[in-house]
Amino acid sequence: FAFTEGPTCDKNGNLFFVDQPNDRIMEWSTDGKLSTFLQPSDYANGMMFDAKGNLIACADEHNELWSIAPDKKISILVTNFDGKYLNGPNDVWVAPNGGIYMTDPFYRRKWWDHTMMALTNQAVFYLSPDRQKLFPVVNDLKKPNGITGTPDGKTLYVADIQGDKTWRYDILPDGSLTNKTLFVAKGSDGMTIDENGDLVMCANGQTNDVTIFDKTGKQIGHIDVPEEWSANVCFGGKDRKTLFITASKSLYSIQMRVKGANPAK
């Protein structure tokens, strides 16, 4: 692989992830078979399955948000905000109600013609379950990147990788956020939650490994990753106790004692 990212698992525990510079989405089945699911993929980045089995993907080539059906039919959910291109949809979390939270930082890509970000802020957006409303819910972070939430749909975590902090928010019924509190003084490229509410976090520029924090923000675990960068994580496998780590040019897995909290992440 050239650079792996965006891990998510379907309802059967099969892993899907991106090999972004090679413009492809890969599948690693529960019986250990590797195949190409979609190529080209619009240089997809962060991904997560929704409850209907659609693969929600940050489509990086044209700064869009896609929904890829099981038959690989593509629906474009978001193309712009207020008539302007998004900066670069990076990672997503699909809430239990079907709403989608998306981080939109700016990382200059070699496949873009433009060199400046289109929007003033590097924000977190929310797309309503009916796909009719898109609005920013976080505007005050330096570079939001990793994102995940609790399976009850009440709490959202957002990592500010440039600010090197991860924040916790309460989710309101309309999808907006309140009660911003500091979870831990560490940013993260990607992250996920286990069934105990522990947060599993990837590289932040200071460390390239995977670090685990309990719900109070206390570090309780550390996984050495023999790569230059750990980009993202998700739980999968038949028992949902396998932690998959996309890291630089490789894909890693480690058997955990706990399951993932979210069905697809």
Where are these regions (language model features)?
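Sequence-structural signature of mature extracellular/luminal beta-sheet repeat domains
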Residues: 1-265
